[in-house]
Regions:
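Short amphipathic beta-strand starts and helix->beta connectors
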Residues: 38-54, 85-87, 116-123, 199, ...
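Short amphipathic alpha-helix segments
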Residues: 43, 106-119, 218-232
Length: 252
């Protein structure tokens, strides 16, 4: 079993009586009908349908937790708060006070079903993929000993085809370009959310001309998220044997 402390992810807390309805109106996923004990991928888009953040939405006490890129957390919290208006919703950036770990491999245990959540006190475990689990909770309560660096978890995410929108790739891609429709992060039957018309039009009119693919790069090739190459754009990259592995949006 491998365990890595995850520091590139931030975490927002969305609480209050109207938290579910508020997120349902903002995100690409049907949050109103999210089953109890289930997390989901979702996107938050601009009015032009471009992803401002890729999110893992996790039901928690009195509301939800939103996992996203750490470099986006303060800005997303601030901009989301602008839409609260009179709703009974409180949005807080808890990135500094919560700890997140990735656990995977032989011996890793947690909820059996994909996206299922288990709770042990304030500690939450989310099944994010085959024998891969996200464990998070208040920093003073999570007692896990890392066995490897965070880049090892990033490599697992890349191999699973799970994109992370960062400051370098923010507001550049509609959700389908990073395969959010295939990953279950978009619900085309739900009502309006920011950018919904453009996202739906791209889907039903066949206007998605770029898609995210996995690729390898040889040793010595320096790649970073947001970097453009041969018509494509790097979404994420991590060291691997004899080079690196990456996710990139490419023409199709």
């Amino acid at each position: 079993m491998e365990c890595a402390r995850l520091t590139r992810y931030g975490l927002l807390s969305v609480t209050g009586d109207d938290a579910r309805a508020f997120l349902h109106a903002q995100l690409t996923k049907d949050i109103e009908n999210l089953p109890p004990g289930r997390a989901t991928l979702a996107g938050w888009c601009s009015a032009k349908g471009r992803l401002l953040a890729s999110l893992l939405v996790i039901p928690a006490a009195q509301g939800f937790l939103l996992q996203l890129s750490r470099d986006l957390a303060p800005g997303v919290a601030r901009k989301l708060s602008m839409f609260v208006l009179r709703a009974k919703v409180r949005i807080a950036d808890v990135s500094e006070t919560w700890a997140q770990f990735g656990v995977w491999g032989d011996g890793a245990t947690g909820p059996a079903e994909p996206n299922a959540i288990s709770h042990r006190g304030n500690i939450i475990t989310v099944h994010v993929g085959e024998a891969r689990y996200l464990v998070l909770g208040p920093a003073n309560e999570v007692a896990l000993a890392p066995t490897t660096g965070e880049e090892s978890w990033t490599l697992q995410e890349i191999r699973a085809g799970r994109p992370l929108i960062t400051a370098a790739t923010q507001d550049k891609f509609v959700p389908q370009m990073v395969n959010f429709d295939e990953l279950g992060g978009v619900d085309f039957r739900k009502g309006c959310y920011p950018g919904q018309e453009i996202v739906a039009r791209a889907q039903y009119r066949g206007q998605v001309k770029r898609r995210m693919v996995g690729a390898r790069a040889p040793a010595g090739v320096d790649l970073r998220p947001g970097q453009e190459f041969k018509g494509g754009t790097v979404i994420d990259v991590a060291p691997a044997e004899d080079g690196s592995e990456l996710l990139a949006v490419m023409p199709i």
